[in-house]
C-alpha cells in the first residue's frame, strides 16, 4: 500500500453485537486507520463489559492517516438518541443508526475514506422509527446516486452475486429481463476486474428454472432471456458459462474454473455459500463509487455485551476491503 488509508466502520445496531465486534477488532494492529462512526460512550461501555482495553482517538481529517495500533480506535462521534442497554432495542436509536450510515457514506463519496465496513443493523427498529429502510445495499445505492448496485457475498473460496435481491419468489421471473441481466453482469464483470484485480473474470451463470428450464419444458426464461443475453456478452469478450442448473453448478468441476457465480435470486445462491462458510462470509456491494463490505450475520441481540460474539466475519470483511483498496490504487 503506497500510503496509509482510512477506512470507516459503522457498528450498526447499538443494542446488538456490532459494538462488541468493533471493540474486538481494536485488539490487534491494522495497516489502515480505523475510523469508527459511533457514540463514544457506547464503545467504552461495551469495552468495559467485555473486559477489553480501548482508547478512543479523535478523528483528525486534516492529519495524515496512521496505521491503527492495538487497543485503539479513531472516533468520528455520532451521538445516541437514547441510552443503550445491551440486547434491548430502543426505537429512537433507529435515527442514530441511519445517521452513522449517512455520515460514513458521505465520507466515502467525498474522498475522506477509502472503504466502508458495516456492522449488522436491525431493519425493524429503523422502520419503527419512521424511516423507510430495506437494507444497507439500497440505502447506499440511493444516497450515492449509483445507477445500479449488485449484492455479492463471498468467502475465501466462493463468490456469489445476485441478479435480484429481496423480492418475493412470485415476482422474480418477471424481474429477470434482458436489461437487468446486461446491467448486473456488466457491473459484476467490471468490479471483479477493478476491485478484485481479476484481469479476465470467469463467471458461472445459474438458470432460473429447475434444470435450467430443461430445454423449455420447465420454463422458457432461459431460452427467451438468459441465453440471448449471455450470447451477446460473450460476443463482447466476456467469459460466461451458463445458464447452468443451480443444483449442479456448485461443484468443484465448475467452481474450480470460475471467479464468481451469478444466481438469479437470493435463496438460489446464498444457502450454498452460507453453508460452506457461515461466519466467514462477507457481503460486498458492487456498483457503488466506493468500496463497501459488511458482515454476513445479524445483530444477535442475545449475545450483546457477553463476550460470546464471533468477530470472524468482521475481520474477513475488513481484510477484504484492504485488499480491494490495494487493487484499486
UniProtKB/Swiss-Prot annotation:
Its EC number is 1.1.1.262. One of its GO terms (molecular function) is zinc ion binding. A divalent metal cation binds at residues 166, 211, 266. The active site is located at the dimer interface. The keyword NAD applies. It catalyses: 4-(phosphooxy)-L-threonine + NAD(+) = 3-amino-2-oxopropyl phosphate + CO2 + NADH. Transmembrane segments: none annotated. SUPFAM superfamilies: Isocitrate/Isopropylmalate dehydrogenase-like. One of its GO terms (biological process) is pyridoxal phosphate biosynthetic process. This is 4-hydroxythreonine-4-phosphate dehydrogenase. Substrate binds at residues 136-137, 274, 283, 292. Its main location: cytoplasm. It is found in: Cytoplasm. Homodimer. GO terms for cellular component: cytoplasm. InterPro entries: PdxA, PdxA_fam. The gene is pdxA. Keywords: Cobalt, Cytoplasm, Magnesium, Metal-binding, NAD, NADP, Oxidoreductase, Pyridoxine biosynthesis, Zinc. It is an enzyme of class 1 (oxidoreductase). Its cofactor is Zn(2+); Mg(2+); Co(2+). It comes from the Bacteria.
